[in-house]
UniProtKB/Swiss-Prot annotation:
Reactions accelerated catalytically: methanophenazine + coenzyme B + coenzyme M = dihydromethanophenazine + coenzyme M-coenzyme B heterodisulfide
Gene source species: Methanosarcina acetivorans (strain ATCC 35395 / DSM 2834 / JCM 12185 / C2A)
Keywords, ordered alphabetically: Cell membrane, Heme, Iron, Membrane, Metal-binding, Methanogenesis, Oxidoreductase, Transmembrane, Transmembrane helix
UniProt-recorded name of the protein: Dihydromethanophenazine:CoB--CoM heterodisulfide reductase subunit E
Entry-linked SUPFAM superfamilies: Respiratory nitrate reductase 1 gamma chain (SSF103501)
Lineage start: Archaea, Methanobacteriati, Methanobacteriota, Stenosarchaea group, Methanomicrobia
């Protein structure tokens, strides 16, 4: 079995996080996320359809019943005449967001770059986790986790910049376009500001460590705490916080589109 892979995150260079510590942080974030999703499923099961709204007094929904009802709507035959096949809805309406493209190409480009960047980075993290777990179980791979992490560095850069482009467009629209600015509420600013902070902190942490572009001449000894800050805020803002914020639309909207079979 290969030697333990060193992590970039830590309080100092000598106090780097271990695999167990990262697993504990990740587990906490996932548990908080799942608890929030159960609460949302219960509210949706009670008929709540808006963000930050609560069920009527005495009304209590069931998460399991909601999921059963939703799945029943997904697989049942369309009755409104314009339902699309599930595969078409998944690819064109959810992955490529064609409904937004029909309304506004610029808004579609913004949404798609944020969605593609975010979800791909999440998937790459999942692949890294799978490789590490495979090694922990003693299964031999043709590469070490450290080598695989190095292999993922280029796609991480590419999709990080794709995400950054989308976030910058979103920020500029909210600042420059009067209609968008006037319609924005504090939750919208927290949402886009949080994604911007997560994205930039990742580039800065990597830049300090490698000395490339985003390091801004900062002392290399700050690389571990910078990486730790990025790791923690990514886990809790981009995972744990989702069910309790307007981020929930990234889950609620695809569920609704699937249930409606692509219908408006």
């Amino acid at each position: 079995m290969s030697s333990e892979m060193a992590y970039f995150s830590g309080l100092t260079d000598a106090l780097r996080l271990t695999f167990v510590q990262i697993m504990i942080l990740s587990t906490i974030a996932i548990v908080v996320f799942l608890y929030g999703m159960i609460l949302n499923f219960q509210k949706w099961g009670a008929g709540v359809t808006g963000y930050a709204l609560e069920p009527q007094a005495g009304s209590k929904g069931s998460a399991i019943r909601f999921l059963k009802t939703w799945w029943g709507q997904v697989v049942e035959e369309s009755h409104h005449g314009h339902g699309k096949p599930i595969l078409e809805v998944l690819i064109l309406d959810i992955l490529f967001q064609r409904r937004i493209l029909k309304r506004s190409p610029l808004r579609w480009f913004m949404h798609f770059t944020i969605f593609a960047g975010w979800m791909t980075l999440f998937a790459l993290s999942g692949l890294m986790f799978a490789v590490e777990m495979t090694e922990k179980f003693g299964i031999e791979l043709p590469f070490t986790p450290a080598e695989f992490r190095e292999f993922l560095s280029i796609p991480n850069y590419i999709f990080g910049y794709i995400l950054l482009i989308g976030v910058l467009i979103a920020l500029v629209r909210r600042i420059v376009v009067s209609d968008v600015r006037e319609a924005s509420i504090m939750y919208d600013w927290i949402l886009i500001g949080g994604v911007f902070l997560v994205t930039i902190s990742g580039f800065v942490a990597d830049g300090i460590r490698t000395g490339i572009i985003w390091g801004f001449g900062l002392d290399p000894t700050t690389a571990p705490p910078a990486a730790l800050f990025h790791s923690v805020i990514s886990l809790f803002f981009c995972i744990a916080y989702i069910p309790y914020s307007k981020y929930i639309h990234v889950i609620a909207t695809p569920l609704a589109i699937l249930a409606n079979k692509g219908g408006e």
